[in-house]
Amino acid sequence: MKISEEEVRHVANLSKLKFSDDETTEFATTLTKIVDMVELLNEVDTQGVPFTSNVADNINYMREDVSVAGWDREQLFKNVPEHEDGLIKVPAIIDEGGDA
């Protein structure tokens, strides 16, 4: 199944991505090869092969909940550029003023 360059551009546009013409051509070629390989699975004869939903025997294995000591705060803060009141200080990413 051939993936067209137009389809690549359409999906890129929906994803807010921009590609050069060369990149678009390369993506179309690569995606076509991937889809062709996946379509080969349709040719596999699975008649008589039992359905398998899970091959692991240890379904829902839960470990014991054990409390352990955490990290030493002073040791952790050695690599932190800025901290305040025992918390790591990071740059603001949301402007508190104006409309969102």
Swiss-Prot record:
InterPro entries: Asp/Glu-ADT_sf_sub_c (IPR036113), GatC (IPR003837). Keywords: ATP-binding, Ligase, Nucleotide-binding, Protein biosynthesis. Its EC number is 6.3.5.-. This is Aspartyl/glutamyl-tRNA(Asn/Gln) amidotransferase subunit C. It catalyses: L-glutamyl-tRNA(Gln) + L-glutamine + ATP + H2O = L-glutaminyl-tRNA(Gln) + L-glutamate + ADP + phosphate + H(+); L-aspartyl-tRNA(Asn) + L-glutamine + ATP + H2O = L-asparaginyl-tRNA(Asn) + L-glutamate + ADP + phosphate + 2 H(+). Allows the formation of correctly charged Asn-tRNA(Asn) or Gln-tRNA(Gln) through the transamidation of misacylated Asp-tRNA(Asn) or Glu-tRNA(Gln) in organisms which lack either or both of asparaginyl-tRNA or glutaminyl-tRNA synthetases. The reaction takes place in the presence of glutamine and ATP through an activated phospho-Asp-tRNA(Asn) or phospho-Glu-tRNA(Gln). Belongs to the GatC family. One of its GO terms (biological process) is translation. GO terms for molecular function: asparaginyl-tRNA synthase (glutamine-hydrolyzing) activity; ATP binding; glutaminyl-tRNA synthase (glutamine-hydrolyzing) activity. It comes from Streptococcus mutans serotype c (strain ATCC 700610 / UA159). Pfam families: GatC. Heterotrimer of A, B and C subunits. Signal peptide: none annotated. It comes from the Bacteria. The keyword Ligase applies.
